[in-house]
Curated annotation (Swiss-Prot):
The keyword Transcription does not apply. Contains 4 disulfide bonds. Pfam families: SVWC. Negative results: this recombinant protein is not able to act on sodium channels (Nav). It comes from Heterometrus spinifer (Asia giant forest scorpion). This is Venom peptide HsVx1. Residues 1-20 form the signal peptide. Its main location: secreted. SMART domains: SVWC. GO terms for molecular function: toxin activity.
Length: 97
């Protein structure tokens, strides 16, 4: 019985280590291997596995609701994510930047 337990443990470990091996996500004609990221304009893509499925995660700037006394300042369009995203500056804190 202990040999069976060792064999099952070995196979489960091997499967966990090879999940997603050789697989990739497609983004605009290029492939991102599982476990890697790709920077593109103001987006960051990550190819990952989730419950034995290959998934593509995309991070991009969120729209912000600007409160009274604050203003939105555009980010540098040539900067990598998240430095390309706009920031919110408010009176009394960072207004004079």
């Amino acid at each position: 019985m202990s040999h069976l337990r060792i064999a099952v443990t070995f196979l489960c470990t091997l499967f966990a280590l090879t999940a997603g091996a050789g697989e990739s996500c497609q983004v605009g004609g290029s492939a991102i291997p599982v476990g890697k990221t790709k920077q593109e304009l103001c987006n960051l893509y990550e190819c990952a596995t989730d419950s034995n499925r290959v998934v593509l995660k995309k991070l991009t700037c969120a729209e912000q609701a600007v409160k009274t006394g604050c203003r939105s300042v555009p980010g540098d369009a040539n900067a990598p994510f998240p430095d390309c995203c706009p920031t919110t500056l408010c009176r009394g804190r960072q207004w004079d930047h």
